[in-house]
Amino acid sequence: MSKRALISVSDKTGLVELARGLVELGWELLSTGGTARTLIAAGLPVTEVAAVTGFPEILDGRVKTLHPKIHGGILARPTPEHLAQLQEQGIQPIDLVVVNLYPFRETIARPGVTPAEAIENIDIGGPAMVRAAAKNHERVGIVVDPASYNEVLTELREKGSLSPETRRRLAAAAFAHTAAYDAAIAAYFQRLMRNEEPFPASFVLSGEKVQDLRYGENPHQGAAFYRLPAPPPGTLAGARQLQGKELSYNNLMDLDAAWNLACDFKEPVVAIIKHTNPCGVARASTPAAAYRLAYAADPVSAFGGIVACNRPVDGEMAGAMTEIFLEAVIAPSFTPEAMAILKSKSNLRLLAAGERAGCRTREYQIRPVSGGFLVQEPDYHVLEPESLKVVTARKPEAKEMADLLFAWQVVKHVKSNAIVVARDGVTLGIGAGQMNRVGAARIALEQAGARAKGAVLASDAFFPFGDTVELAAGAGITAIIQPGGSIRDEESIRAADAAGIAMVFTGIRHFRH
């Protein structure tokens, strides 16, 4: 009796070549719908599943393979009892199942797709066959990825059958395939129901490997980069690398931090990042001007940094960036002139992320902890000027207010405890990741130096004492923005009034760990 392969695929890549190879090896082909039509058009002998089951496809193709003559043929073990039952029921064994599933993830990635369209692309029969074959991998081969076709054909030609090790490996890939598929469906429905249940009882997460990384944060740590199902344009996972060396784990961490910061602004902004903290951020009328200001904010730290711009990189900005060593640049796009200039920096990694809107579509932030993970909403809070509360005798002037709002937007992207000193839409000093707030302020003010005179200061959380205000006053800071809410707020307010500093409370905290 010849061996039988059941083939039913949405992705027709390599289909005809695989099927022809199986026929040449003497295999009988079973197939359904569009797959069968493709094989017949290629001149290959095919038995349609309906001829095996004696039952036609029904319900617009929703029911094709859900039949004992199919699943019995897949699930039967090579035992005398099972083989006898197959013979009694007139069922022939199926030895190889080649299935990939309806393009659900591709469907939900389309702009404007409706729930009805998404639901129609939820495969039922396909996952059932995949799981059945994977469960019975002791006897049955299961192939879900066209990239495996050549390997399978080669082994069948050389050995006549698939080894137990190969079948086990293919089964593992098949179970991962259906798990990721179901996870994408679950995530889609969670998204639809998010207003009713923002944190579901079961949180499903899956990813598709983009690439193995050379190592993790350190050379002794392994690492890989995974993409969530159907990432929208404007995200790091959806970005295209245009040139440069292979991305590292640390590159990706810094690129994400830089891109999220730059995209938080509507006007042209450039952010330069080191170890996920900004070292220079500036807004200006053009990308090139913003880059020069961001670089000048801290040229020492900018060396070897990651740059993000929320506007297309043009030739002028590209030329400015060639003057120092940078690890990577991410932007919506790069003009042809910019690409021609940056080509001389062949190791510089360039990423085109597409439209900026996508970088604010992250639904959850997920952090691993021992034995589990934490989930929270992203910090996308936008501060409205009218919500600010002036708590000092002096109100901020218009120019000070503009700088306060700029510094406040930057400080939420700095590791806590965080202090940002800024003036004219440029950061002058950033104190990040300190165990006490006055220590963060001291770092930011020392970095700003004489430039702190006439500048503003932003704090990601309230001042527990008046010492930070006193330190700011001594450096010449004229206005402060902070959440407020300390039991000693009056101490900070008195210190500000004594120095003639304008201070506003936001009522919102921006801790970042």
UniProtKB/Swiss-Prot annotation:
Q: Which GO terms describe its biological process?
A: 'de novo' IMP biosynthetic process
Domains: what does the record tell us?
A: The IMP cyclohydrolase activity resides in the N-terminal region.
Under Enzyme Commission nomenclature, its number is: 2.1.2.3, 3.5.4.10
Looking up PANTHER family in the UniProt record yields: BIFUNCTIONAL PURINE BIOSYNTHESIS PROTEIN ATIC, BIFUNCTIONAL PURINE BIOSYNTHESIS PROTEIN PURH
Q: Any idea where the MGS-like domain is?
A: 1-144
Keywords on record: Hydrolase, Multifunctional enzyme, Purine biosynthesis, Transferase
Q: What reaction does this enzyme carry out catalytically?
A: (6R)-10-formyltetrahydrofolate + 5-amino-1-(5-phospho-beta-D-ribosyl)imidazole-4-carboxamide = 5-formamido-1-(5-phospho-D-ribosyl)imidazole-4-carboxamide + (6S)-5,6,7,8-tetrahydrofolate; IMP + H2O = 5-formamido-1-(5-phospho-D-ribosyl)imidazole-4-carboxamide
Asked if the record carries the keyword Transcription regulation, the reply is no
The identity of this protein, by name, is Bifunctional purine biosynthesis protein PurH
Task: Provide the family line.
Answer: Belongs to the PurH family.
Write down a Pfam family by its short name: MGS
GO MF terms held by the record: IMP cyclohydrolase activity; phosphoribosylaminoimidazolecarboxamide formyltransferase activity
| Superkingdom of the source species | Bacteria
Query: GO CC: one term?
Result: cytosol
Pathway assignment reads: Purine metabolism; IMP biosynthesis via de novo pathway; 5-formamido-1-(5-phospho-D-ribosyl)imidazole-4-carboxamide from 5-amino-1-(5-phospho-D-ribosyl)imidazole-4-carboxamide (10-formyl THF route): step 1/1; Purine metabolism; IMP biosynthesis via de novo pathway; IMP from 5-formamido-1-(5-phospho-D-ribosyl)imidazole-4-carboxamide: step 1/1
